[in-house]
Amino acid sequence: MQDKDLSTLQTFKRLWPTIAPFKLGLIASAVALVFNALADAALIQMLKPVLDEGFGKVDNSLLRIMAIVVVLLIFVRGVTNFISTYCLAWVSGKVVMVMRRRLFRHLMYMPVTFFDQNSVGRLLSRIVYDSEQVANSSSGSLVTIVREGAYIIALLTVMFYTSWQLALVLFIIGPIIAVIIRIVSKKFRELGKNLQNSMGDLTSSVEQMLKGHKVVLAFGGQKIEEERFDQVSNNMRRRGMKVMAASAISDPVVQIIASFALAAVLFLATLPEIMTQNLSAGSFTVVFSSMLAMMRPLKSLTNVNAQFQRGMAACQTLFALLDLETEKDTGKHVVDTVKGEVRFENVTFSYSGKEHPALNNISFTIPQGKTVALVGRSGSGKSTIANLVTRFYDVEQGKITLDGVNIQDYTLANLREHCAVVSQQVHLFNDTIANNIAYAVTEKCTREQIIEAAEAAYAMEFIEKLENGLDTVIGENGASLSGGQRQRLAIARALLRDSPVLILDEATSALDTESERAIQAALETLQKDRTVLVIAHRLSTIEKADEILVIEQGEIKERGSHQELLALNGAYKQLHSTQFNH
């Protein structure tokens, strides 16, 4: 138990620096709570002269003064309750936003191995739900005490049972409160819908980044994703504050109206018609105290600790995620341009948890401006080779060089700046076609450059037929486009990037023959004067490659040109015969 308490204390201490920048909100809330407590104390104290002197002996003018004071005190209580609730909600919203942004940035720089081992849904839960729980632990518990401490509606029954004459005042006040609640409820529905939409935007933004993590890494899109997420997270925070403001302001309004019921009870108690009904001091005290008690329910206090512990548990989970190492980026080498020679030297690599290596002592060279194709059965290690070039994974043994420099000596951003990737699984963002193509470049590009890239990729053929052309929003992951169209946008993106090293990872394997022919010319344009690594499923697409490597079980079994490999009458010839005899 002591260990648990210590862990909770340590977790909160670590969380405090996140809360500290917003401590003015906490101070304002605390001051408001002090005045709120003083108002409550004054209300209770006002019962003393009534009980001390006896109900029938109190000067009527004193009761009339007390009626005015009650209204003022309840007004103060309502205002301070609103200030306290709003300030705490402001702090809570800020803490949530900071935690979400920190998690989002951290996830964008995590290695691919991390995403291999963690589901997208779980990560979304960390960002969206767990961060909310952290806010509940830091300030939400106090919000619960303030807000939930304002009501015990059950005391209304006690009031009517004790003195229905005095409690009858509520029949006048009740309809007014009902109207307010109806108006506020309608507003809540509207605000709630807006908040749900914001939650959808937030989840969509995170999901796009997570699903397209390789694209973000390969094209250096972290800044774009960060700005996009900053915007949607702030929109959600502001809409959340509107919901909280509406909730917080409705409480004091109802309380202020209820205070008129208190004043009315005091005035009615001075009337002879009421005085002659044998209204005892005890009955009066019960009715009056019950009205006060409606503003101070305590039943939710027992849940505060549980709420705090849930928040701390979520906080520990998030800190554990933030403590995970991001991609290793220890390289210092930065160059503006490279020639593009890629060399594998005795490279061995194994995936985590796998018994056998995915690559075993691989060595080959892709000279500047040449094309090397990798062929082999599924799972032979072809895609692993491509992933190693961009350092989505790091080699265990051996090394990979770019222009004679170990790729681990380059900074990650600089290495990936020199590489363009077109893969089988094209990831497009829920944005315009123009922005999807321009995603490849870190600096701003002109409309003409985008059009030029689209034309070179033979994408303008279908883009011009769309109603909004380049400004067409294509839906999540390009849902409104065909496979061939999506692939041509990926090629246009790579053309615009204009990197000297090009990786084509089974770029046509998922397309039908007609679509494949449509983009083959685009691929040939893309490969011109570039160092190209092609992972091919269809051998017809790599017959012109300068060298073809046949990969089996992580090793190079054969190498040579198309004609040379056919002449060997080995594994390549068998693959070729299998495809072309069907």
UniProtKB/Swiss-Prot annotation:
Gene3D superfamilies, sorted: ABC transporter type 1, transmembrane domain (1.20.1560.10), P-loop containing nucleotide triphosphate hydrolases (3.40.50.300)
So what EC number does this one have? 7.5.2.6
By its UniProt entry, which CDD domains does this protein fall under? ABC_6TM_MsbA_like (cd18552)
The record's section on SUPFAM superfamilies has:
ABC transporter transmembrane region, P-loop containing nucleoside triphosphate hydrolases
Q: Which domain of life is it from?
A: Bacteria
Present the record's domain note: In MsbA the ATP-binding domain (NBD) and the transmembrane domain (TMD) are fused.
**UniProt protein name:** ATP-dependent lipid A-core flippase
